[in-house]
Structure formats: C-alpha cells, structure tokens
Regions:
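Short, small-residue-biased leader/transition segments that mark boundaries at the very start
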Residues: 1-8
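Central hydrophobic cores of alpha-helical transmembrane segments in multi-pass inner-membrane proteins
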Residues: 11-23, 46-47, 116-127
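A generic, lipid-embedded transmembrane alpha helix
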Residues: 20, 38-51, 81-86
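Transmembrane alpha-helix boundary signature
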Residues: 47-64, 86-95, 123, 159, ...
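P-loop potassium selectivity filter motif centered on the GYG triad
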Residues: 61-105, 169-212
Length: 212
C-alpha cells in the first residue's frame, strides 16, 4: 500500500543513528545475490548468539525462577525455529526459559524474522518491477525501517493495551497462590505482554506460556 511504501522513502534520526553505529550506508544498493547473502548472514549470526544465550541462561540475569540451561538439541531446534518464523516449541516458556532468554532470544527473533521476511518480500517486488537487476534495495536499511517504522510502534501501543487489560509485564518470579478449592496453582510472571504482541503482529505462534 501507499502508506507502507512511504516507510522506505524517509529517514529519521533514529534510523540515522542505527546506520552510523552499525556502519551501514542505506543508499548503497545491492543486487539479489548480495541482498540474499546479507539476509542469510545476518540471521545466521543472530541465531548463533541466540543459541549461546539459551545454552548458558542459568548464569544470566533476569532468572528469578532459576531456570536451567537448555540442552543442545532443544536449543538448536528452538533458535532455528524462531529464526525461520516457524516458532515450533518443544518446551514450556514459563519453565524452560529465563526472562533474559525470552527477551534476547525469543522476542528479538520474532522481530528479526518478521522484518527479514518483509524485507525479502519487498526486494522480490522491486525485482519484479524490473527497474534494475543490480539494485533491489539495501537489506540492512530495509530491516531497520521495517522494525522502527512498523513493528516497534505497533508493538509498543499494542503491548501497553495488553498491560492495561491485565497481561503481566514484569521481572518477578512465578507466584504460587491457593485456590478456592484449597489447591495450589503457579501463576506465571514475566515480560508476557511484550512477547504476545509481536507474536500476533509478526509471527504465526510461539507463546510465552506452555498453554500458548
């Protein structure tokens, strides 16, 4: 649409700061091979970092529930799943991930995978337009603009609406309460609202809780 197309025509101070820090020239075009390599390389690096975080999460911050490290095959399956936006979960978030892992791995990859998919789609459309086969855009610029202009603004507003409606957004440990029947139930805490909003905006599933 025209509104989404305008996202790629403007640059603000936030974008400029990100480009400057990362050393990206947003005006430098890429051919399709360079674009694809940038997309794959960026996601591969992020997946590697995410895998390491999952493997050492017990030693990190924001782990009030004392979650242990994720074992190698499960960590690999998890990070590849969220990198590819398939979001296959063979764990329960409230008992298998620290809050740091939820934020730096799951939530982060939900943003990156959605933005990467959108960027690839835009580059494909540029290629079909046939202006030049040697310039389908700049992947890094597209990734930044999609994130800062579309995903983050909607996520912030939507996340605040979820918090307003009572969805937890904190770093407290899980709470054990006694029900009216006299049994005990664990109430999960954590940055749930932040994850749930990007889940609905940019992915096809993968919730904070095991019940999803």
């Amino acid at each position: 649409s025209r509104g989404l197309g305008d996202v790629y025509k403007r640059q603000d101070r936030v974008d400029g700061a990100i480009y400057k820090i990362s050393g990206v020239d947003p005006g430098k075009g890429m051919n399709w091979k360079q674009y694809a390599l940038a997309l794959l390389g960026t996601n591969a690096v992020m997946a590697f970092i995410g895998y390491l975080i999952l493997r050492v999460q017990s030693a990190g911050l924001f782990n009030p529930n004392n979650i242990e490290n994720m074992e190698p095959t499960l960590a690999f399956n998890t990070i590849i799943s969220f990198m590819t936006n398939t979001n296959l979960q063979h764990y329960s978030g409230e008992s298998g991930l620290s809050y740091l892992s939820q934020m730096l791995v799951i939530i982060f990859m939900m943003f990156v995978s959605a933005a990467s998919g959108y960027a690839a789609c835009v580059a494909f459309i540029r290629g079909l337009a046939g202006r030049t086969k040697n310039d389908v855009g700049n992947f890094f610029a597209d990734l930044v603009r999609i994130t800062t202009r579309i995903l983050l603004p909607f996520s912030i507003v939507g996340g605040l609406l979820l918090v307003w409606q009572g969805v937890p957004q904190n770093f407290e440990g899980n709470v054990v309460v006694e029900t009216l029947e006299g049994t005990f139930q664990v109430i999960a805490m954590g940055p749930i609202a932040a994850l749930e909003i990007i889940k609905h905006l940019g992915t096809n599933g993968g919730g904070f809780l095991g019940a999803n």
